[in-house]
């Protein structure tokens, strides 16, 4: 975590969980009840259901190449929402994208085809899983697909109680 003091770190995590996580879980359950679609239609419906407005100008979306290998590198200030927003924006142009994401987020059947699991370093077979991730990523790029990645590997966190979110060092 961001804090060296385990008590502070746990307190922040608890506050975040009690506020944002509960609301997010309610939204997810409501979305599931509404009939979450499989595949590419998932992204725009999820974004609308969550009440997220994407203000990226269409001329910027038009800069996304419609074909050919592409790597999208992004900061990660908002957690799950970052991947969803990028997926929705890329999906407006092409649906051959994959998001490198922690393995615990890959079990969602509706969007599993868009995920490449990134193992946690503490997993018993992390090295083997990491090699599989790399191979799958390279195969997808060689086939002309899009890879979306968050190089810090974690959500940006505040260094204090009220400060701005700061990106972690990149893990490249």
Indicate residue ranges for each PLM-predicted region.
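Short, flexible loop segments at the rims of nucleotide/cofactor-binding pockets, characterized by
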Residues: 47-52, 76, 123-128, 163-164
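Conserved nucleotide-cofactor-binding alpha/beta core module
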Residues: 91, 98-142
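Short, glycine/charged-enriched secondary-structure capping and boundary segments
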Residues: 86-88, 113-115, 162-164
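Membrane-associated lipid acylation/remodeling enzymes share a hydrophobic transmembrane-juxtamembrane segment
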Residues: 95, 138, 142-172
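Amphipathic coiled-coil/heptad-repeat helices and related helical stalk/stem segments
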Residues: 57, 82, 130-134, 169-171
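Structural motif
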Residues: 71-73, 117, 148-150
